[in-house]
Swiss-Prot record:
This is Fluoride-specific ion channel FluC 2. One of its GO terms (cellular component) is plasma membrane. One of its GO terms (biological process) is cellular detoxification of fluoride. The keyword Ion transport applies. It is a multi-pass membrane protein. The chain crosses the membrane at residues 4-24, 38-58, 63-83, 96-116. InterPro entries: FluC. Na(+) binds at G73, T76.
């Protein structure tokens, strides 16, 4: 694959990942009755599982770049997670802020591990 093709692929596939994040986050947020950022949590946990799965496969360098960096990188969002956690703290919702950190880290690690284990079964 040429460098130009990889760059174009990253741009296009990254666009798909970011649109999917917008759709999933919005759908979850509309159904959640609390100010807790559940949409971002669902996106990041599913992204961790997917990246773990992709990491467990024997992908070529280009395929890993397109699937992992472009799609999953655009789909997941560390910066939004941090901003939403900081806002919970500003609003004095300290338990929710701490829960967002702990749940994201613990379940994110577990999701990545499970994804990787599932890939080894394929």
């Amino acid at each position: 694959m040429t460098t130009v093709a990889v760059w174009v692929g990253v741009a296009l596939i990254g666009g798909v990942g970011s649109v999917l994040r917008f759709v999933v986050d919005g759908a979850v947020a509309r159904r959640a009755s609390r100010p807790f950022p559940l949409g971002t949590l669902v996106v990041n946990l599913s992204g961790a599982a997917l990246l773990g799965f992709l990491g467990g496969l024997a992908l070529s360098r280009e395929a890993a770049l397109l699937a992992g960096t472009a799609f999953v990188g655009a789909y997941t969002t560390f910066s939004t997670w941090m901003l939403e956690t900081q806002r919970l703290g500003e609003e004095r919702q300290l338990r929710a802020a701490l829960a967002n950190i702990v749940v994201s880290v613990v379940l994110g690690g577990a999701a990545a591990f499970i994804g990787q284990q599932l890939a080894q079964l394929v």
